[in-house]
Design a protein with these regions (language model features):
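N-terminal Rossmann-like NAD(P) cofactor-binding subdomain of oxidoreductases
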Residues: 1-192, 227-229, 257, 262, ...
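Glycine-rich beta-alpha junction loops
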Residues: 39-41, 129-130, 154-161, 196-204, ...
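Short, solvent-exposed beta-strand edge segments and adjacent coil->beta transition regions
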Residues: 120-121, 242-246, 312-316
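Oxyanion-binding "anion nests"
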Residues: 193-240
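A short beta-alpha structural unit
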Residues: 233-250, 284-289
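Glycine-rich phosphate/pyrophosphate-binding beta-alpha loops
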Residues: 235-238, 321-326
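Hydrophobic alpha-helical bundle architecture
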Residues: 251-252, 256, 318-320
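A common structural junction motif
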Residues: 259, 264-274
Length: 341
């Protein structure tokens, strides 16, 4: 088997660190690993497969010799540096928003549109975490009945804002437990502990936030459904890890609840956890505490959409997934695996 020189831009962040773990867990054929981060992190070491890897400063010239570069940096750094990686001969798989809606850049979820990697021109984009978590179970149902509309509410963990988000929530919880003054929020617009924040991203179209519009815009591109209609509300919740979503789908063809369950029970990347009707049911359904640090999207609470005038064409379900793994790092490594297949 061939092996590849792999670089990670943003190697010290939450997603970059998870990419390292995923490369190792999936036994990706790495010949030489290069880690790029800010000048502040340069010179530090990270362990990979029992060896110490020195972090290099990320510069336009740093990518020479890389075959694949995984991007885990913010939009501005991605726009500034990753085109230089392509010029140096690497194929880039980027987790930022910078290139997602570029017409020349495939936006890929391997379980859905893995073949799109074939038309890449040097950059492949990783979708937004909430998009991935919602679409992995939606896609197999679409293949059976044809999705026309999605109504989605997301419940997004603090770690969706990276390490600072997690640290801020932990500090607030600790202060509450000790009866101390609440630390001033900085990662979020308001206190998150014992609270919900119904805004993620800036306001864009018709009062929807940038995060809410991503699911429609990215979903249309990934599923090749330019007319897909999505109504999404995104909420930040006081959970450390794993996003949850309530999704109602409207179909163009009839689908029974039993059919939908059968489809999801065998769908790639999905785990059906919906034991309400089982003889030994314990009312166990997907929860973020169970889906953290693993790669499957758990689906449950499946039921008909009784608000639909044709109840045979509406399904509602609840899903949870680790947004750092499948919602970011794992999805990127899966794309890399498609490239070297």
């Amino acid at each position: 088997m061939s092996s590849y020189n792999v670089g990670i831009l943003g190697a010290t962040g939450a997603v970059g660190q998870q990419m390292l773990e995923c490369l190792q867990e999936r036994d990706f054929p790495v010949a030489d690993l290069r880690l790029f981060a800010s000048a502040r992190s340069a010179g530090k070491t990270v362990e990979f497969k029992g060896e110490k890897v020195v972090i290099e400063e990320a510069t336009p010239q740093c990518f020479k010799g890389c075959d694949i570069v995984l991007g885990a940096a913010g939009d501005d750094i991605a726009k500034e540096l990753l085109p230089h990686a392509v010029e140096a001969g690497a194929t880039v798989i980027d987790n930022s928003h910078a290139f997602r809606m570029d017409g020349d850049v495939p936006l890929v979820v391997p379980e859905i549109n893995g073949d799109d990697v074939k038309w890449n021109k040097g950059i492949i984009a990783n979708p937004n975490c909430a998009t991935i978590i919602g679409l992995v179970p939606t896609w197999p149902l679409h293949q059976v009945a044809g999705v026309q509309r999605m109504i989605v509410s997301t419940y997004q963990a603090a770690s969706g804002a990276g390490v600072p988000g997690m640290r801020e929530l932990e500090a607030q919880i600790a202060a509450m437990g000790k009866g101390e003054p609440m630390p001033e929020p900085s990662a979020f617009a308001a206190q998150l502990a014992s609270n919900l924040i119904p805004q993620i991203g800036g306001f864009k179209y018709e009062g929807f936030t940038s995060e809410e519009m991503k699911l429609q815009n990215e979903g249309r591109k990934i599923m090749h459904l330019p007319e897909l209609r999505v109504n999404c509300t995104c909420v930040r919740v006081p959970v450390l890890r794993s996003h949850s979503e309530s999704i109602t789908l409207e179909f163009e063809r009839d689908i029974t609840l039993e059919q939908a369950r059968e489809v999801l029970a065998s769908a790639p990347g999905v785990k059906l956890v919906d034991d309400r009707d089982a003889a030994d049911a314990h009312d166990r359904f997907p929860m973020p505490i169970d889906t953290s640090d693993q790669d499957l999207i758990w689906v449950g609470r499946m039921r008909r959409d009784i608000s639909n005038s044709n109840v045979s064409r509406g399904i509602t379900f609840w899903c949870c997934g680790d947004q750092i793994r499948k919602g970011a790092a794992t999805n990127a490594v899966q794309i890399a695996q498609l490239l070297v297949k």
